[in-house]
């Protein structure tokens, strides 16, 4: 017999702890207006370099395609950074990139002032051109500004930006700490089908609702959520490192069971976009948060289906059958 159940789990996740957690970015613009970004948060498949390049382009006021190279985590050239951990990259490194881009825009305005003969507060850098906000002066291409500066100095236009989240540790009056500047939130709902004869659990539907702030790149956010849910499904149903006397009993993927594409259901996503004032263009983060509520929601769905609580992961067919049998015998 197969029974279905629905489970729900909600989580919060802290972003960018204050203290020793700075981020730095360095840009240089060549004579054609194209920009190289130097950052230290490695992109290991999550798409952070793409998202950060989008932030940079917006902050400078140039097309995204003008960010032609991203040098990430090169110990010879990149600034120091804490790394791609703790779902911090969009918030911490993103703010550093935004600040660096704004500094480069300030430099471009100062150089455009010399060409356009108007004050910098009357100049806007938009879509790769310096515009007079009154429209009385012909726009100047950023590439022309950059070429003029390189011809004059022999150096590209450079800018540096840094950001460090603020944390309050042990306030002297209240004794309270504010370690994290912001948090992300998520709720996930899952429907499962449990075979009471074999103990097998099959996920039939998943809904994931996440507050990640403003989405810089919605497609990358959805990829992160799908990846986190896939990891959570493995944690909940199949993945387990078996140890005996300090030795791993299942050291290969032939006996350490990862979920495949056949195990991942269609995932309905609901984005709750809030505007985080301290984040880069309102963004917060997404990454690990997608993993957090997945296994609890699955275990709650198993309970809803067959009335048994699985209290250790993974919820293998053997554990589910044992729990069903124990309930029947009670």
Feature roles, as predicted:
Residues 2-9, 15, 54-330:
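C-terminal catalytic domains of large/alpha subunits in multi-subunit enzymes
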Residues 34-39, 203-205:
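Short, aliphatic-rich beta-strand segments
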Residues 9-31, 39, 46, 182:
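Conserved beta-alpha junction segments in alpha/beta enzyme cores
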Residues 49-50:
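Conserved strand-to-helix beginnings and helix N-cap segments that scaffold or border functional pockets
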Residues 41-42, 98:
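Conserved short loop/turn motifs at secondary-structure junctions
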Residues 1-4, 33-36:
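Immediate post-signal peptide segment of exported/extracytoplasmic ligand-binding proteins
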Residues 31-32, 127:
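Residue-level signal for tight coil/turn positions that link beta-strands
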């Amino acid at each position: 017999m197969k029974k279905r159940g629905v489970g729900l789990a909600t989580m919060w996740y802290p972003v960018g702890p204050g203290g020793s957690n700075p981020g730095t970015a360095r840009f240089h613009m060549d004579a054609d207006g194209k920009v190289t970004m130097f950052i230290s948060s490695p992109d290991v498949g999550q798409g952070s370099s793409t998202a950060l390049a989008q932030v940079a382009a917006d902050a400078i006021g140039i097309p995204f395609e003008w960010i032609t190279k991203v040098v990430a985590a090169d110990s010879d050239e990149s600034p120091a950074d804490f790394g791609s951990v703790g779902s911090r990259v969009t918030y911490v490194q993103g703010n550093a990139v935004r600040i660096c881009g704004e500094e480069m825009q300030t430099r471009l305005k100062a150089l455009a002032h010399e060409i356009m003969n108007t004050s910098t507060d009357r100049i806007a850098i938009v879509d790769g051109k310096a515009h007079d906000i009154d429209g009385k002066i012909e726009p100047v291409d950023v590439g022309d500004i950059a070429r003029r500066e390189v011809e004059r100095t022999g150096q590209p236009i450079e800018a540096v930006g840094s950001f460090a989240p603020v944390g309050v540790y042990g306030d002297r009056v209240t004794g309270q700490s504010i370690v994290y500047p912001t948090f992300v939130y998520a709720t996930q709902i899952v429907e499962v089908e449990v075979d009471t004869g074999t103990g097998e659990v099959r996920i039939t539907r998943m809904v994931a609702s996440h507050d990640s702030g403003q989405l810089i790149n919605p497609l990358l956010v959805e990829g992160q959520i799908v990846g986190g849910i896939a990891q959570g499904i493995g944690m909940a149903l199949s993945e387990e490192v078996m140890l005996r006397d300090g030795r791993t009993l299942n050291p290969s993927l032939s006996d350490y069971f990862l979920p495949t594409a056949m195990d991942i259901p269609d995932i309905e996503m609901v984005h709750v976009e809030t505007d985080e004032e301290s984040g880069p263009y309102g963004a917060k983060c997404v990454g690990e948060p997608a993993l957090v509520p997945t296994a609890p929601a699955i275990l709650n769905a198993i309970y809803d289906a067959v009335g048994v609580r699985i209290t250790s992961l993974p919820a293998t067919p053997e554990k589910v059958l044992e729990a069903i049998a124990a309930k029947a015998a009670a």
